[in-house]
Amino acid sequence: MRKSEFNAKSCFLMIGICVFNLNSSSCIIKTNAEHCSKRLFSFCYLGVGVIKKPLHLGNRKNMLFLSFLLVCLCEEVQMLNLTTTEVSATEFASIASKNMETNVSTSSDYLTGKSETTFSANPETWGKNVTEISIASVAYLNQSSMVTSTLAVGTTNRSSGNNVNVTTSSFPTVKGDEAQDIETFFTVILASTLSDVSEKTPQGLPTKSTPKKTVQALWETDTVQVPELTDTNEGDEEYFKDFLSSLVIWICGISFVGAFIIVIVILYNWYKKDKQRSLLWDEENKPDVQIRRDAKTCR
């Protein structure tokens, strides 16, 4: 690879990393979609250094550059799958109906990003024959400088009992080592019932009973305290283990892909040389070549 080409790729790499770090370190972000679009733009800009010039797979620097870009893109795709559009606290406050007779408890693993929520619906409130409830749960940090995230939507069946477990796959990002207060809200977006619940419906909900009736309501959990990550040795150890396991998986994956490409290149070169050898052998064994060789021998 020419020196000028290497310098151009190095410049694109450094500029892309700088833009990526600036976007990642921004504290006040309106929506997760905007945040992800900025990060993807950074990686597209970073990839110009690869697309602009033709790459030679045999060059180790190019292979390292491609591996780095592949890991970054995979991380971005994973982040896009975990984030959705957030709902602000003011929107929830405008539709809040806080007289729901429910008890909500939340247990969250802030290192793995998973949260499990259990709520007990009072039979006198909801009726005994409510068959299905869909829940959209949202958690946000109570500081405007923190990044927010919308949790996943869970569907559950209450036909077997009143306790309902909801497991979500993402949680707001906690920046810094200080303890933060997180307020979590759960919105009932769909409740189907087959019985008359006109006398058992909480205040603010529809009072008419119809088959497969849809109701909307919201209730608020207590504020939960996020532990200080640096003070939890066990949590730090688990985080370190997860980091090591992810690192090993990435290294093994990149090594496998690299080895596969190397094998393909070796087989292609072997096939190319064998074909050239075969053509040379056929050329030497042609009748006119053999006659000229015999004539030279007779002289």
Curated annotation (Swiss-Prot):
Record keywords, A-Z: Host membrane, Membrane, Signal, Transmembrane, Transmembrane helix
Membrane topology: Single-pass membrane protein
TM segment ranges: 247-267
Record flagged with keyword Transmembrane helix: yes
GO cellular component terms, A-Z: host cell membrane; membrane
Signal peptide range: 1-27
Location, primary (coarse class): host cell
Source species, domain of life: Viruses
Full protein name: Protein U23
Taxonomic source organism: Human herpesvirus 6B (strain Z29) (HHV-6 variant B)
Organism lineage string: Viruses, Duplodnaviria, Heunggongvirae, Peploviricota, Herviviricetes
